[in-house]
Amino acid sequence: MRQLHEAFPHRDPTKLGENEVLDFLISLRQQRKLKDSTVNQAVCALRAFYRDHLGRKWKGWSQIKIRRDEQLPNVLSRDEVARFLGAVRQGRFLAVFTLMYHCGLRLSEVVSLKPGHIDASRGVVRIIGSKGGKDREIPISKALIERLRAFWKLHRNPEWLFPSPGRGWKSAGATLPDALRRSTKPMSDSSVQAAMRATVVALGWDLRHGRRPVTCHTLRHCFATHLLDAGVSICLVSQYLGHSSLKPTLVYLHLTEASEAKAREVLANFPGL
């Protein structure tokens, strides 16, 4: 209402006509360049005032449809991904981040992995009961399988691929491998996010240095974008991401058709191994 008063400083808002109010709303987007979310708030406020409070049965409200802001995901180049992975300080988090990037996994998916979810004979990672309750399989390179096998052999936890050492393991006098081996809980989301933030800050990529946020989910965006840039089918990429339709995958788009063999070849050449 404040902005409406500024646009019509000498008019009673209750005396404004339909066209005047609708033209004002359109000007917020086209002339003032306000964000779509801000314009939508103004639409809702004025609709409540004129339609619900004053009872104005204007037909023009149906014409005001402001699309939500569509922000493209933050994507690192391959070189930047390699720099990021090279800056991770602890081996267990390096294994997590490498797997997230190479397989496009959500944070919740990677920390929930069990050793048996890595099918070395078929070269796939099985994601069980992911978002939407769907299972899926994602190809994984032999080099990454060997790296994960070597990491697991350091702790040999029978239940979790990435177990949590638990709080106070250092003060208890345990070694990290022993703490991981005895753990009954998976690595926590917060510990992975903390390792991500520490690495981002160490690289100077945090918000204080003018970059958009780099988060765990950024690695999933990189996975999708780098596959599409290499010509892998959007249908395969959507399948690997676990999307229920192609629509959410289209945000990454620019692609040509390629076979799963091409996808495996591209994945084998991802940096970090």
Task: Report the location of each language-model feature.
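Conserved catalytic core of the tyrosine transesterase superfamily
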Residues: M1-L273
